[in-house]
Regions:
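Iron-sulfur (Fe-S) cluster-binding modules
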Residues: 3-59, 63-213
Length: 213
């Protein structure tokens, strides 16, 4: 899907190079030299691997778990077809979901919340957990230890755009469609970095994969 480097699609190559080699606090480069000798030219944007070559099988993850890779190899050796799960992370997460469904009335970052309730769904506690939009390949390791999912395994096969799916889930949890007193812009204002939150690992594979100039 492009991974974390894909967030570079929010800037031009020139902006990235200037920030990395000239403007960064740790860089001493008074002449403003951009390294270029024997350095390959950067493409205009990061692309998912599927746009660069034909893919027979993609095992997602950043990085993929060793047991998932091992099982994939064993499946091939048995002459069987590898099938990735179509379920999302919430379906395997051990945390308790409210009987009436997920609901939010605030968004908090983890340091603002403090220590989450040990067994309750993180979304209902105000944390943006990417579980609803992420494929269930990791065993919900992060939510199990009270860290919200960041979406590093990418979407399920049923989802075209991981970030869009999560934005829809947040809007639903807030009751934006049902409660007309909830202002969508007010909800969005509670997120300091919308793209970085919803597309940390998949921006290059999104329906809109880069900042439009």
């Amino acid at each position: 899907y492009g991974g974390i480097p894909g967030l570079g699609n929010l800037w031009t190559v020139e902006e990235l190079e200037e920030e990395a080699y000239i403007n960064s606090v740790s860089t001493v480069n008074p002449e403003g030299i951009i390294p270029h000798e024997d350095v390959p030219h950067l493409e205009s944007r990061v692309r998912p691997l599927s746009e660069c070559m034909d893919i027979d099988l993609m095992i997602p993850g950043c990085p993929p778990r060793s047991d998932v890779v091992a099982e994939a190899i064993l499946t091939l050796l048995r002459g069987e077809t590898i099938e990735l799960p179509s379920t999302n992370l919430c379906e395997v997460c051990p945390r308790e979901k409210p009987p009436a469904g997920l609901a939010m009335d605030f968004i908090k970052r983890q340091f603002e919340l403090g220590k989450p309730e040990p067994d309750l769904c993180l979304i209902t506690q105000g944390l943006v957990c990417m579980g609803p939009a992420t494929v269930s390949l990791c065993g919900a390791e992060c939510p199990s230890i009270a860290i919200q999912c960041r979406g590093c395994y990418g979407p399920t096969s049923k989802v075209l755009d991981q970030g869009a799916k999560m934005i829809s889930a947040i809007a639903s949890d807030y009751g934006v469609n049902e409660d007309k007193t909830v202002d969508p812009e007010t909800v969005a204002d509670q997120l300091d970095d919308i793209v970085g939150t919803f597309y940390s690992y998949t921006l290059p594979a999104a329906l809109v994969p880069m900042k439009m100039q």
